[in-house]
Amino acid sequence: MTEELTKTTENKPIVIQAAPLVPAPDEIGVLSRTERAGFWLTHRMNLGIAKRLMTFGQRHIGSLWIYLATYNLMNVFGIENVETTDVDTPLVLVANHRSFFDMYTVSSVLFRRTMRPMELYFPVRGKFFYDNPLGWFVNLVMGWFSMFPPFFREAREARKREFDKFSMRRLVQLCSEGRGHIIGFHPEGKRNFSDDPYSILPAQPGIGKVIYSAHPQVIPVFIAGLGNDLPKQILGNWTGGPKIRIWFGEPIELQEFYEKGDRLRTHKELSDHLMAKIAELGEKDREKFG
């Protein structure tokens, strides 16, 4: 997706990124007026100067309030695995999903405990975050518009999956190129509400397809201790709530999957492999805290 156009004085290639993709008329046309407005707003906030401003806000404001709400409970392991990744190759973080706040908390840890250049993207369901102005506001306040690109998966609105073709292309582009790109995924596709913090849901093949197509760096992440009740979570920071544990694993080698055919079975096997690596981190957590 990129071409080397010239060379620096050190004889290193300057790589020019492809222009950000935009949806075709028949893809954007299936969305409602509100959804289209939400998409174009968020799309523009993830480009150029606007994205740099949003990243500044995440680093200096967003990460601060998350830190203030969790610092007494936070335990982080393996952050050096993120520090040593190549900033010129996109990094995908694949994590289990038990709380609405999983990736927000991970992003705060990244900003406050590493010096790595980064631009964050978190694919999200279009429902609420794109079809409701309140959802746009939550995306701004919680994620600085990093909840992008959207996917429309509601069974009653199957026709909107035409738009998902664009979102998949854009996601592959983000995972293929871009200095400092970090993309957060939950391979399970939805939150796990089981009482067992070490249980995992079946992996969905979509993440396997994206990674197969893009060949990014991939690091597994296991998260435990976060809840879904924001006031209770914040209060627990001072009243002895459950310890929050975030484990970053080593980069996952995926060459064996890239050598297989580009088909659904390969994508599912790759996704299952990612969940197995996340589960391995869960076992480390069980040994230490369980």
What spans do the regions from the language model cover?
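A generic local structural motif
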Residues: 61-62, 76-81, 110, 168-170, ...
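A transmembrane-helix-recognition feature enriched in membrane-embedded lipid enzymes
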Residues: 23-77, 105-108, 112, 133-145
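Residue-level signal for beta-strand positions within conserved beta-sheet cores that form or flank
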Residues: 72, 116-118, 242-244
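Catalytic core of membrane glycerolipid acyltransferases/transacylases, capturing the structured
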Residues: 86-160
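Non-catalytic C-terminal accessory region of glycerolipid acyltransferases
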Residues: 2-37, 41-42, 161-290
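Short, flexible loop segments at the rims of nucleotide/cofactor-binding pockets, characterized by
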Residues: 52, 67-73, 158-163, 196-198
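Helix-to-loop junction immediately C-terminal to a conserved catalytic motif
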Residues: 65-97
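Hydrophobic helix-cap positions at the C-terminus of alpha-helices
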Residues: 82-85, 113, 174-178
